[in-house]
Regions:
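Small-molecule kinase domains that catalyze NTP-dependent phosphoryl transfer to phosphate-bearing small molecules
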Residues: 19-20, 49-51, 71, 75-122
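Amphipathic alpha-helical segments within well-ordered protein domains
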Residues: 9, 66-70, 81
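Residue-level signature of catalytic and energy-coupling elements of molecular machines
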Residues: 8, 37, 101
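ATP-dependent NMP and nucleoside kinases share a basic, alpha-helical "lid"
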Residues: 21-72
Length: 125
């Protein structure tokens, strides 16, 4: 039910955002990290791109996403399609995110892409 989901998001996501920024502030104050990565649902939908230095998009084709959701979470194919229908289209992520990680080539290749992207990010600071 879209109305219930919208109400749930309106309740939870402002609190999630507050907690994310509370934790970021604590890490900054303690000088614990060279950079901070945040992974959360609805980052673009909630306007986080205005708060972070960079946004990354981890991409995998639809068939692989469905396969992983079915295997990892036990979802039906119908449930997978319902979830994906509520998400922003891939084009939006590709437009708004400065880095795209292709996650269909296996863990090793994904790790290499992330390592390269992190090194590139760190070279800027």
């Amino acid at each position: 039910d879209q109305e219930k989901l919208s109400r749930l998001n309106a309740i939870t996501h402002p609190n999630v955002k507050k907690e994310i920024f509370r934790r970021i502030q604590r890490i900054k104050e303690k000088g614990e990290a060279s950079f901070i990565a945040v992974e959360a649902a609805l980052l673009l939908e909630e306007g986080y791109q205005n708060d972070f230095d960079t946004m990354w998009y981890v991409y995998v084709d639809e068939a692989t996403r469905i396969e992983r959701l079915k295997e990892g979470r036990g979802y039906t194919e119908k449930k997978c399609h319902e979830i994906m229908a509520k998400q922003l289209p891939e084009e939006v992520f590709r437009k708004e995110c400065s880095t795209v990680i292709d996650n269909h080539l296996g863990i090793s290749e994904t790790e290499n892409q992330i390592k390269t992207a992190v090194e590139s990010l760190l070279s800027l600071y």
